[in-house]
Amino acid sequence: MHFDPVADIITKINNANRAKIVELQTEASKLKVAILNILLNEGYIRGYEIYDNKEKTKSILKIKLKFDENRVSSLNGIKQISKPGLRIYVSAEKLPKVLNGLGIAIVSTNEGLMTDKLARAKKIGGEVLAYVW
């Protein structure tokens, strides 16, 4: 069975966000942590913690979503773009602007995961993993 960690974390964040759940858990991986670092730096989540799981080999990620006092999320949407069956690669000049710059695109480059704004500034392209707005 093949497993897509990007689809897993995006689906879990979307489902928890729609249900107004503040905390969620998932198995940890380096890719998931890199995605969460970007979401944290851009202000879309409150934080995350990594716990060692005694029963299993994988560590556990506890993700804290960000809501205001009226239970309105700071994350309006997150969508997977590049999928295992259809990878989407773009050059630095063709990096997409999400909602005319109001959102971000998460791009996997040869220098690691970064936002579309940072990749455009460094003039490097890569695989567009997700749109966040």
From Swiss-Prot:
Subunit structure: Part of the 30S ribosomal subunit. Contacts proteins S5 and S12.
Gene3D superfamilies per UniProt: 3.30.1370.30, 3.30.1490.10
Keyword RNA-binding attached: yes
GO biological process terms on file: translation
Family matches, as PROSITE patterns: RIBOSOMAL_S8
GO cellular component, as recorded: ribonucleoprotein complex; ribosome
Chain's role: One of the primary rRNA binding proteins, it binds directly to 16S rRNA central domain where it helps coordinate assembly of the platform of the 30S subunit.
Gene encoding the protein: rpsH
Keywords: Ribonucleoprotein, Ribosomal protein, RNA-binding, rRNA-binding
Family membership: Belongs to the universal ribosomal protein uS8 family.
Top-level taxon of the source organism: Bacteria
GO terms of molecular function: rRNA binding; structural constituent of ribosome
InterPro entries: Ribosomal_uS8 (IPR000630), Ribosomal_uS8_CS (IPR047863), Ribosomal_uS8_sf (IPR035987)
Name of this protein: Small ribosomal subunit protein uS8
Keyword rRNA-binding: yes
